Curated annotation (Swiss-Prot):
Gene: hemE
Protein name: Uroporphyrinogen decarboxylase
Sorted UniProt keywords: Cytoplasm, Decarboxylase, Lyase, Porphyrin biosynthesis
Pathway assignment: Porphyrin-containing compound metabolism; protoporphyrin-IX biosynthesis; coproporphyrinogen-III from 5-aminolevulinate: step 4/4
UniProt lineage: Bacteria, Bacillati, Actinomycetota, Actinomycetes, Mycobacteriales
Organism annotation: Mycolicibacterium vanbaalenii (strain DSM 7251 / JCM 13017 / BCRC 16820 / KCTC 9966 / NRRL B-24157 / PYR-1) (Mycobacterium vanbaalenii)
Function: Catalyzes the decarboxylation of four acetate groups of uroporphyrinogen-III to yield coproporphyrinogen-III.
Length: 354
């Protein structure tokens, strides 16, 4: 059942949709994470995978940064490999390493063995979403998933990779196997996001963390059609959709093609390597922008933070003047674990003042 709320006063939802928000909206990727002592206390008793499949922990961890920082959106606590695990792929998230796949996907037979995601396998996620929409008041909840390319990279490499050489070799040299893999992962991503939408999330974001390793030509040929199908399949729910990657300056136009044109508010995330004003010229008309403070800035002392935050807000306003339909303040990537939570709280307050 669709239990989504009406949130007409939400600055986040207003900015994405091209309406004038009451204030500059702000939230931060990985706002629920190791920067928070309350998060570390919970995680000391549970593995990452245990936490991602426990409705009580998902709910509590998602709420922690909203309580502490007063951000304008909550993002569901999860991990991009959760739907892979739920689909039966043997993997774990190893501390200080990341996702590790027990049996990497390297052949056409390996791809054929990938099973669809049954929605019942992510029931704890749906249960947590139902609770969260009842507890968040007027704060919207963002659901998310990893994009097919980034999931494919983890599966083919067997874990994090610097050069993604096996992934690119399959993509370029075994095209039929590659597209079969991307089709299977696109279906899994759609199923995971649909379960979140059906449970009541107010928006979705798709993370293509490793897309920046690709040339524009390769992205358009081997990735864009699959990512576009994710967004096209979810558009009927009517929720705003965001597409984010790291190091994707040359891909911003193509990434906006994937997320726009579906009849719902669309946004593209921008990292700190590209100004928001430049991004506005690269994305399709009708696209909002999210970003783009360098996460490391939050470690550099308050005078540096304040100066950089003001610069991002000003750049966001210039981007809107240049054609972006709205701006949501965020980091260019996730909050670093060493970040002082008080600095995050002060950053949120400063953005709200500007």
């Amino acid at each position: 059942m669709n239990t989504r709320r009406e949130l007409p006063e939400s600055p986040y939802l207003a900015a994405v949709a091209g309406r004038k928000p009451l204030r500059v909206p702000v939230w931060m990727m990985r706002q629920a994470g190791r920067s928070l002592p309350e998060y570390r206390a919970l995680r000391a008793k549970n593995t990452m995978m245990q936490a991602c499949f426990d409705a009580d922990l998902i709910t509590e961890i998602t709420l922690q940064p909203v309580r502490r920082h007063g951000v304008d959106a909550a993002i569901l606590f999860s991990d991009i490999v959760v739907p892979l695990r739920a689909a039966g792929i043997d993997l774990d998230i190893v501390p200080d390493v990341g996702p590790v796949i027990a049996q990497p996907v390297r052949t056409a037979d390996d791809v054929a063995a990938i099973r669809p995601l049954e929605p019942s396998r992510v029931d704890p996620v749906a249960t947590a979403i139902g609770r969260l929409v009842g507890e968040l008041g007027d704060v919207p909840l963002i659901g998310f998933a990893g994009a097919p390319f980034t999931l494919a990279s983890y599966l083919v490499e067997g874990g994090p990779s610097r050069n993604h050489e096996r992934t690119k070799a399959m993509m370029l040299g075994e095209t039929a196997t590659w597209h079969a893999l991307m089709t299977a992962l696109t279906d899994i991503t759609i199923a995971f996001l649909r379960a979140q939408v059906d449970a009541g999330v107010d928006a979705i974001q798709v993370f293509d963390s490793w897309a920046g390793t690709l040339s524009l030509a390769d992205y358009r040929t081997y990735v864009l059609p699959h990512s576009a199908r994710v967004f096209a399949s979810l558009a009927g729910a009517g929720v705003p959709m965001t597409h984010f990657g790291v190091g994707t300056a040359e891909l911003l136009g193509a990434m906006s093609e994937a997320v726009t044109g579906h009849g719902v508010p669309a946004m593209v995330g921008v990292d700190w390597r590209t100004s928001l004003t430049d991004a506005a010229a690269r994305v399709r008309p009708g696209t909002a922008l999210q970003g783009n403070l360098d996460p490391v800035v939050l470690l550099a002392g308050w005078p540096v933070v304040e100066r950089a935050v003001r610069a991002v807000v000003e750049d966001g306003r210039r981007a809107v003047d240049a054609g972006a339909v709205g701006h949501v303040f965020n980091l260019g990537h996730g909050v670093l674990p060493a970040t002082d939570p008080a600095v995050i709280t002060d950053t949120v307050a400063l953005v709200h003042e500007l």
